[in-house]
């Protein structure tokens, strides 16, 4: 079970939003690359980036910050003899050229959210063009998928869409319960497990992680197909210590950094 720190980018800064509201942003760092280094030093083995301005604008808006983070990650990996630290990014990705540019910059995975729901043909093309590198981000409230930075609720059921996207060849699904994201109310374990059980590709949980108990609860059901969990406000505000939580997850999973790396080869 991987704990994946989230670095949400707004106006070049690292922030956290409450329930996706751009007007409720807390700035945690004016240097996102420094924040990336901090989480790597705390034991992160993968990073999750979100271009918040991009998600609302429908095109990349924080590319300089993304490049700076990727450079910091490369330097850290080289210095510590680590072959690769995967970095994934979502927010405002609506065309194949943008995906190609970001992958060339050094991203491992591209997350497609709103565009996957509104334009499934684009997702299909992306999965074909970049196999194994496309993740679908599904944000849901009460089992229904939300789009456009959570501002619109669609009529689509999460599981129906996820199965369709699995058929397209996406690498995994990030499932965010937007009723809980940034509120630290605990992960919606039941909904996450239900989704994971209906898929053969991995599910990454997101939204609501508050403390070590949430991590332990996810570890207890990880064999249903839950690969990791994205951590945001909890690690920034200190209700969850990333290093000790990842150590605990490794202990419960019977996995250490070495076996995790081997599993990803």
From Swiss-Prot:
Q: Name where it mostly resides.
A: cytoplasm
GO molecular function of the protein, one example? Answer: 1-(5-phosphoribosyl)-5-[(5-phosphoribosylamino)methylideneamino]imidazole-4-carboxamide isomerase activity
Q: In which pathway does it act?
A: Amino-acid biosynthesis; L-histidine biosynthesis; L-histidine from 5-phospho-alpha-D-ribose 1-diphosphate: step 4/9
EC numbers on record = 5.3.1.16
Q: Which Pfam families did the record assign? A: His_biosynth
Reactions catalysed according to its record: 1-(5-phospho-beta-D-ribosyl)-5-[(5-phospho-beta-D-ribosylamino)methylideneamino]imidazole-4-carboxamide = 5-[(5-phospho-1-deoxy-D-ribulos-1-ylimino)methylamino]-1-(5-phospho-beta-D-ribosyl)imidazole-4-carboxamide
Q: Which protein are we looking at?
A: 1-(5-phosphoribosyl)-5-[(5-phosphoribosylamino)methylideneamino] imidazole-4-carboxamide isomerase
Q: Which organism is it from?
A: Herminiimonas arsenicoxydans
